[in-house]
Amino acid sequence: MNEPLPRPAGALWGLVSRPSWRELRLRQEGRDLEAHPIWTGTGVPPGQGRHIVLVPGFLAGARSLSMLEPWLQRCGWDTRRAPVGRNHQPGEHVVELLEEWLAETTAMEGGPVPVIGHSRGGQEARVLAVRHPDAVSLLVTLGAPHRVLYPPHLVVRAPAAALQLAAWIRRSRPDLTGHRRYEADRVGPFPSSVPFVSVYSHSDGFLDWRLSLDPAAEHVEIDCTHLGLAASVPAFEAIARALKSL
């Protein structure tokens, strides 16, 4: 947990600081996944109809869960994909939506439920678990930037800045109170009662793996792309191991 943070990124460095071409492996990762026994549920703990909340990544929306969600359903889980669209709204606004979704899901389940978040969705899911530890039975984050609000890569930082500015203009003034609250819970103490697994990859083409390190989490290193953290054999194996703890 003493790994230094990546160097601050200017525009040019932010563009080239991560080898984004690694993400070209994603298609092959998908083919490998569909040919692997885990894709049909082999070795995966059966969900037995239990509910599970899924939070998609930044700008990707449902696409980032296009393999994870049907796989969990095939394994017997009743998936509840969070209604956050492409997940481009300010973090506090997204978490407010997640809080309503979590309340509905736990009411349906009759108790706490596991939450899985990819990329920015994992960061938001951490905030959700901090605020509602009694409603979350397990938190699994996949390539989540726990140590910064947004990764320094220009592919992420540029649209994030533009969308944040647009959101502030629409609201006439920034929600600074909400932003401060979100930031405090993003990096603040995590409830010891909630199992927390942070999965990351050194081969991530967008996010420096060190940004996924959280002092409260069990860290699981795998080898895949950033998008493959929700669509690859090693990612699904890591998720299956985490679900076995329930």
Locate each region found by the language model.
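Serine-dependent carboxylesterase/thioesterase catalytic core
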Residues: 51-63, 67, 73-87, 91-187, ...
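Contiguous hydrophobic segments
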Residues: 13-37, 117-133, 145, 196-206
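Amphipathic, positively biased hydrophobic alpha-helical segments used for protein targeting
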Residues: 68, 132-133, 154, 212, ...
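Sparse, context-dependent recognition of short Cys/His-centered cofactor- or disulfide-binding micro-motifs
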Residues: 9, 18, 43, 124, ...
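C-terminal catalytic-base region of ester-bond hydrolases, centering on the histidine
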Residues: 192-246
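Flexible, membrane-associating and regulatory peripheral segments of lipid-active enzymes
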Residues: 1-53, 60-71, 75-82, 105-108, ...
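Residue-level signal for well-ordered alpha-helical segments
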Residues: 42-45, 49, 56, 75-79, ...
